[in-house]
Amino acid sequence: GQGCSYGCHPKNISISVESCGITEFILTTICEGQCYLEDPVYISHDEQKICNGDWSYEVKHIEGCPVGVTYPVARNCECTACNTGNTYCGRLPGYVPSCPSF
């Protein structure tokens, strides 16, 4: 059921960016988590929900380099319908428990 405590939420992560041959790490925000989905035994056309959000892009200027680096930032996160135009909406291979323990 919906008893899982792992919902969709923003998470701060560090990513590497490169410009002018210089690499730096910056902090950004991504969407992370699981969305409730009943997986019936029969094939149906239920709308699959994924953890996604509103994204914007920011620019980081590395010292000594005139070329800025654009990187994504999640502004908010929620369980939304899976968009096959920009996301893999198929099943994950293998066994994925509905409420994994991390």
From Swiss-Prot:
Q: State if ATP-binding is listed as a keyword.
A: no
Q: Which SMART domains match?
A: GHB
What residues bear carbohydrate chains? Answer: 12
Q: Which InterPro entries match?
A: Cystine-knot_cytokine, Glyco_hormone_CN, Gonadotropin_bsu, Gonadotropin_bsu_CS
Give the primary localization class. secreted
Keywords assigned by UniProt, alphabetized: Disulfide bond, Glycoprotein, Hormone, Secreted
Superkingdom of this entry's organism?
Eukaryota
Extract the GO molecular function terms from the UniProt entry.
hormone activity
Any signal peptide, and if so, which residues? none
What is a single cellular component term in the Gene Ontology annotation?
Answer: extracellular region
Where it sits in the cell: the answer is:
Secreted
What does this protein do, in the record's words?
Involved in gametogenesis and steroidogenesis.
Q: How does it assemble?
A: Heterodimer of an alpha and a beta chain.
- The molecule here is called Gonadotropin subunit beta-1
The organism is Thunnus obesus
The record lists the lineage as:
Eukaryota, Metazoa, Chordata, Craniata, Vertebrata
